[in-house]
């Protein structure tokens, strides 16, 4: 049957074969499409039936064996899946899905050490995008059993291979803060920026690392580069405002926070931060205005009402403070 036949025709042919009425022939590609169709509609039993039949007709098809193993894992038949993957590896040890699925099976069987050893060995066999995919997989394994330093190491390796990898850049920012490896992150991102000066995420991560070391002036400079490259980078404005507040640069912080409101969905914490800045520069009316905006978004937070009352007290308007708290 031609590979470009409509999926409905393929399904009819498959059903005839299952019923023992068909004398036709389904190609390897047709079985792949049928399995994918049943998998997409969450009909795992039919997908497995198609996989079993496909493997029976094409016992040397690595692709069909891998699909069968994937379905076995979905059905929590992990040991059977490992046996099928062993057969697939004999046919094509360069299929990255074999290693990813075997890792999933090992983790499900609580065999983390085997999963790590498998991936570490496989990483040396692949290059390019496939090596990066395996490093992400290894990072996830380390995350599962809380080897957090090793997650940072995996992400750093990915960025050594692909300095513009957005997923790695996003993730390493979090893990830098979590592991406290700010100095290492600074060296890494300075190197990336040297080669790719318009990488806004690298500038952001550099700024965040400086911020982690309380080097707020350097942090602000790096955030300003990030927003010069990407003027809609709301998290850069948000973090830069925090650094400015720590340096008591409240008017500049207000400008950054107002930009956050323009770019992102309003949050009570942002309104509270603006209110705090106005309170620090003794513009109590504006402070109250933003604290009230925060309270509209989060009416159950009693601390916001105390902040409003506090501004009245600082103006010696005690009656209004009491009246506000009473309401």
Segments (PLM) and residue ranges:
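Structural marker of alpha-solenoid helical repeat scaffolds
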Residues: 57, 90-92, 125-127, 161, ...
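Canonical positions in the second alpha-helix
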Residues: 54, 87-88, 122, 157-158, ...
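Start-of-helix register in tetratricopeptide repeats
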Residues: 29, 63, 97, 131-133, ...
């Amino acid at each position: 049957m031609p590979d470009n036949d409509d999926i409905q025709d393929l399904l009819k042919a498959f059903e005839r074969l299952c019923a023992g009425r068909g004398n036709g022939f389904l190609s390897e590609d047709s079985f792949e499409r049928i399995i994918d169709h049943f998998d997409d509609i969450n009909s795992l039993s039919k997908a497995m039936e198609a996989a079993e039949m496909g493997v029976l007709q094409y016992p040397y098809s690595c692709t069909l064996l891998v699909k069968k193993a994937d379905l076995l894992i979905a059905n929590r038949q992990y040991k059977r899946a490992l046996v099928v993957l062993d057969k697939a590896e004999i046919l094509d040890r360069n299929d990255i899905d074999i290693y990813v699925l075997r890792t999933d099976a090992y983790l499900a069987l609580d065999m983390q050490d085997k999963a790590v050893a498998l991936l570490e060995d496989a990483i040396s066999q692949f290059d390019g995008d496939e090596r990066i995919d395996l490093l992400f997989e290894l990072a996830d394994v380390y995350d599962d059993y809380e080897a957090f330093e090793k997650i940072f190491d995996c992400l750093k390796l990915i960025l050594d291979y692909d300095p513009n990898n957005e997923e790695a850049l996003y993730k390493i920012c979090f893990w830098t803060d979590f592991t406290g490896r700010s100095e290492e992150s600074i060296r890494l991102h300075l190197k990336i920026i040297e080669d790719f000066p318009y990488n806004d995420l690298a500038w952001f991560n550099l700024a965040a690392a400086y911020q982690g070391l309380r080097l707020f002036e350097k942090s602000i400079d790096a955030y300003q580069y990030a927003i010069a490259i990407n003027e809609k980078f709301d998290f850069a404005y948000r973090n830069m405002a925090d650094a400015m507040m720590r340096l008591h640069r409240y008017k500049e912080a207000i400008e950054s926070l107002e930009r956050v409101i323009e770019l992102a969905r309003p949050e009570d914490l942002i309104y509270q931060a603006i209110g705090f800045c106005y309170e620090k520069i003794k513009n109590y009316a504006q402070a109250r205005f933003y604290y009230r905006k925060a309270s509209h978004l989060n009416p159950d937070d009693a601390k916001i009402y105390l902040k409003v009352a506090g501004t009245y007290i600082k103006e010696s308007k005690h009656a209004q403070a009491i009246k506000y708290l009473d309401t």
